[in-house]
Amino acid sequence: MAKATTIKIKLLSTADTGFFYVTTKNSRTMTDKMTKTKYDPVAKKHVEFKETKIK
């Protein structure tokens, strides 16, 4: 079997609320760490989310 190209990642809020999203990314085309601006319902505003490992 071939190695999967899509992997699951965790996007953790930079507002230190502990809120996170789980999404997928293509590990072959996106080799750097992913950052996205998304809504954090704990902070009640849009903040930047950075990629971390799923434990």
Curated annotation (Swiss-Prot):
The keyword Ribonucleoprotein applies. Keywords: Ribonucleoprotein, Ribosomal protein. The keyword Ribosomal protein applies. Gene3D superfamilies: Ribosomal protein L33. One of its GO terms (molecular function) is structural constituent of ribosome. GO terms for cellular component: cytosolic large ribosomal subunit. PANTHER family: 54S RIBOSOMAL PROTEIN L39, MITOCHONDRIAL (PTHR15238), LARGE RIBOSOMAL SUBUNIT PROTEIN BL33M (PTHR15238:SF1). Belongs to the bacterial ribosomal protein bL33 family. This is Large ribosomal subunit protein bL33. It comes from Rhizobium rhizogenes (strain K84 / ATCC BAA-868) (Agrobacterium radiobacter). The lineage of its organism: Bacteria, Pseudomonadati, Pseudomonadota, Alphaproteobacteria, Hyphomicrobiales.
